């Protein structure tokens, strides 16, 4: 699936291809969500205060799904979810634990692979592959 996604430009994603990606994600029992349930018109990063308002909803999603692992993208989101200062560069391939309703979850901070994070996309891919190979 990864190679097929890499081989398509965003404008070439049609409904059929999107259905394929969603089906593959479902078959592999992956769940994808976003801490921020909104965005700004110009796609600027959201302030911490806005993202923190969505934490309860995210934790409810996690409590329902009960994932084996959680991957967070970028310093900002990783820090908010883990409630401590996180620098992805210092936490590559390391997990932190969070507890939600007496269930513990492994959280792996990973570089945000788009926007300004595009410069670290190779590291993000490397870390995600490592996490999959070692955790799934």
Each model region followed by its residue ranges:
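A polyanion-binding, active-site-adjacent surface
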Residues: 1-90, 104-119, 123, 130-131
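Short acidic-hydrophobic surface loop/beta-edge motif
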Residues: 91-101
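Short, hydrophobic alpha-helical segments
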Residues: 132-136
């Amino acid at each position: 699936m990864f190679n097929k996604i890499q081989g398509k430009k965003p404008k070439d994603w049609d409904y059929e291809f999107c259905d394929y990606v969603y089906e593959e994600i479902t078959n592999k029992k992956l769940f994808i969500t976003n801490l921020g349930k909104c965005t700004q018109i110009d796609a600027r990063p959201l302030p911490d205060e806005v993202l923190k308002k969505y934490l309860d909803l995210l934790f409810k999603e996690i409590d329902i799904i009960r994932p084996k692992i959680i991957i967070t993208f970028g310093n900002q989101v990783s820090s908010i979810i883990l409630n401590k200062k996180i620098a992805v560069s210092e936490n590559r391939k390391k997990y932190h634990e969070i507890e939600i309703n007496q269930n513990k979850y492994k959280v792996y901070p990973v570089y945000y692979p788009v926007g300004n994070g595009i410069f670290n996309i190779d590291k993000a891919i490397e870390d995600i592959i490592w996490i999959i190979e070692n955790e799934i």
